[in-house]
Amino acid sequence: MNKGNGKFNFWQKWLTYANLMTIAVGLLVAFAGNSFFFEIHNNYTKDVFLNGNEFDQNILELKNWLFGIIGGTIVGFHILMVMISENSFKKKEKWAYKTMWYGLLTWFIIDSGISIYYGAIHNVIIINLVALVLIGIPLIMTKNEFKN
């Protein structure tokens, strides 16, 4: 294995593990959205949408339902990312590289844009930027492998 392949392999594995970690976060979103894992996010959400008041029972049920389907979507999206990373991306197929960027950036722009529109900047900072950096770094670091 030459040095270039070692570098590529490192970043490809980072990409896989970052997405596996995000799958775990998606499961937490779906099944533990009111736990200490999301206390900061939930507190900021209350500040933005409820003037700092607690969720009443109806709002809490709506939030739990939304977190459930959002968590499921996160899990499904990142399972696809892992499968692409471990197969076509690893084989340096250009479509895989482009697809990962398209999926990541489409999610980031839509999710962050809506969050900003509604004043939920905390979602962009706490969740979206972390995921963008965590998954974007290995994509940036491997771009030269997909030039042909």
Regions found by a protein language model. Name each.
Residues 1-7:
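Short, Lys/Arg-rich, polar N-terminal cytosolic tail immediately upstream
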